[in-house]
Amino acid sequence: LGEARWRRLNRTFFRDWPSHTPWFREIPREFVHYLSEAEIKQPLPAWLAELAHYEWVELAVDIMDCPMPAHDDQGHLLIGHPVLNPTLMNLSYQWPVHKIGPGYRPRKRQPTQLLVYRDTDDEVQFVVSNPVTARLLAILASAALTGRAACLRIAEELQHPSPETLVNHGLTMLVQLRDQGVILGIRQ
């Protein structure tokens, strides 16, 4: 944006936006709402609201107060019910927000899936994902399914000609997600 445009944008936010919280750490979320909802007169990059959200997510995950649920970290991920990391944010963006910086400004939309979560050392982690993995995690988050049942649901949605092949690939992905800390294990 450049320093002058950035300062002008910040001034209009603090002056015009009716913040809904007095908490200092909530101001970044209010700024995300401002960029997404306000009628801002100055021209802004199309990706700016998503970039602000991506930057806010790191703070949100870092300060989440989520106890870790009971789980068996060595349980079989196809037979058991996978337990997701409670700090996980399974995100989809229209822009490659994780690449935007001083040396890169995207000109075209590029759908991007990212997983953001806090690992066992309380460090915020960012993982580039894909639509199938994002969908698998969404299924696991919304339904009490075994890993196998979730993989079979994906196979059905994709109309995969060989569901068992997809289940085998799904197991590989579930193990990788457990190794990364996205999945903690299975329900006890």
Task: Spell out what each predicted region is.
Residues 81, 86-142:
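Low-complexity, glycine/alanine/valine/leucine- and proline-rich hydrophobic stretches
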Residues 1-73, 127-188:
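Long, charge-rich, low-complexity alpha-helical segments
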Residues 75-79:
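Short aromatic-glycine motifs in intrinsically disordered, low-complexity regions
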